[in-house]
């Protein structure tokens, strides 16, 4: 009976509890994982509803670039990697089969935001066409970056017949990622708007910097900073003002900085550029940027929590639950230090069990809730209509 009552108290996955300290220490591993497993949500249904609002099917498979001969040729080469464990195949699977939990619908959010405001001009149809193009190129840039991150480091001294598929996969990842980024930049130039070009280019700069932020292992996988005492959790979304020494080792600051650099600023700048194309004032543009960043951070926190509570699989060592656990129990950093050369050497099951014994899960839920509420507050400042209501559904359903 005591077990049942504990389970009922933890039944809601994203409604954080008032008490932060963990009450899970007395449970077994299996009991903890059952309690934390997120419930099924009809995400695909919400996506279809949102696409009806914008009047456009926004999945990546519908992007016009996929109809080109160049992409078709690359897809043929990509098929040769079927059955291999190359990282580029995992990314391709997420894109082609619509794994929305790994690839959130950023383009759809930008289009919904575009529909939420009235364009102060008679040529609203042409503006919305530009905003749709902006949504597409934002998705392409993000996907191209993810594919480039799928490159596997194969030291020259270790190359042999067994590594041939890795080397071939790297060539495909480079070509495919380059194609998407070049096509996206061509579409961006086609908008013929210098201000939009500057805003989106700022996000591309952030994506590049994300690959050099903090320590990395031999495969360029991120390693968290050594835990430090935190006196202030506040951090700006203006990436030019973020200093690595000021955030590394400080759980929320480090997580926010890494996540913003690693793509969230692209979503924020995409939302900002959408308002710029829609002839909105600077205040509305700033609201849109803040909204986009908070949406991206909320979704990332939710995705990381779901990844952690899966029964199997490797999770990111710089995810929010890990960083919060290190804050609560700095001794856990010894487990990570032992795998500094290759993060795969970490005993993830043992690390997961130790994480779940801290208050990291509660804090990650609070992190999601905090950014979701802030995102809704910013979108309320922009508009009140069907598009805004649909954005709120997307935030809450994820």
What is the predicted role of each segment?
Residues 185-204:
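Transmembrane helix-loop-helix
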Residues 67, 71, 131-134, 197-200, ...:
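Hydrophobic packing residues in well-ordered alpha-helices of helical domains and bundles
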Residues 377, 384-398:
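Short, amphipathic C-terminal "tail helix"
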Residues 2-166, 214-249, 372, 392-398:
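Conserved N-terminal diphosphate/IPP-binding helix and adjacent helical/loop segment
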Residues 171, 250-262:
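A short glycine-threonine-serine/GTX helix/turn-capping micro-motif
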Residues 173-183, 187:
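Post-HExxH zinc-binding segment in Zn-dependent metallohydrolases
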Residues 24-42, 112-121, 146-167, 185, ...:
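Acidic, Mg2+-coordinating active-site segments of isoprenoid diphosphate-utilizing enzymes
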Residues 72, 142, 178, 182, ...:
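Generic structural signal for well-ordered, non-transmembrane alpha-helical segments
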């Amino acid at each position: 009976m005591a077990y049942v009552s504990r389970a009922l108290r933890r039944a809601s996955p994203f409604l954080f509890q008032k008490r932060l300290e963990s009450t899970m220490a007395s449970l077994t591993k299996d009991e903890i994982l059952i309690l934390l497993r997120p419930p099924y949500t009809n995400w695909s249904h919400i996506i279809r509803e949102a696409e009806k609002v914008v009047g456009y099917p926004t999945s990546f498979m519908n992007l016009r670039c996929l109809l080109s001969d160049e992409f078709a040729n690359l897809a043929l080469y990509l098929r040769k990697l079927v059955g291999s464990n190359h990282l580029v195949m995992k990314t391709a699977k997420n894109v082609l089969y619509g794994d929305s939990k790994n690839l959130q619908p950023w383009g759809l959010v930008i289009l919904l935001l575009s529909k939420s405001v009235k364009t102060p001009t008679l040529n609203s149809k042409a503006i919305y066409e530009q905003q749709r193009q902006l949504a597409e190129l934002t998705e392409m840039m993000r996907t191209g970056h993810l594919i480039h991150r799928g490159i596997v480091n194969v030291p020259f001294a270790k190359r042999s017949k067994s590594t041939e598929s890795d080397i071939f996969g790297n060539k495909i990842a480079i070509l495919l990622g380059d194609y998407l980024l070049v096509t996206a930049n061509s579409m961006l130039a086609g908008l013929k708007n210098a201000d939009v070009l500057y805003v989106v280019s700022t996000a591309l700069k952030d994506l590049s910097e994300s690959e050099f932020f903090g320590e990395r292992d031999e495969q360029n996988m991120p390693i968290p900073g050594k835990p430090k005492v935190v006196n202030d959790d506040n951090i700006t979304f203006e990436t030019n003002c973020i200093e690595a020494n000021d955030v590394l080792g400080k759980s929320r600051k480090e997580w926010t900085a890494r996540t913003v650099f690693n793509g969230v600023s692209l979503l924020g700048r995409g939302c900002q550029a959408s308002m710029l194309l829609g002839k909105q004032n600077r205040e509305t543009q700033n609201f849109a940027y803040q909204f986009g960043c908070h949406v991206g951070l909320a979704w990332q926190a939710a995705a990381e929590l779901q990844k952690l509570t899966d029964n199997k699989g490797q999770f990111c060592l710089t995810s929010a639950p890990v960083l919060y656990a290190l804050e609560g129990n700095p001794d856990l950093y010894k487990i990570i230090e032992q795998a500094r050369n290759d993060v795969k050497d970490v005993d993830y099951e043992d690390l997961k069990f130790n994480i779940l014994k801290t208050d990291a899960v509660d804090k990650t839920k609070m992190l999601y809730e905090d950014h979701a509420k802030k995102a809704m507050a910013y979108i309320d400042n922009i508009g009140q209509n069907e598009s805004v209501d649909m954005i709120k559904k997307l935030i809450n359903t994820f």
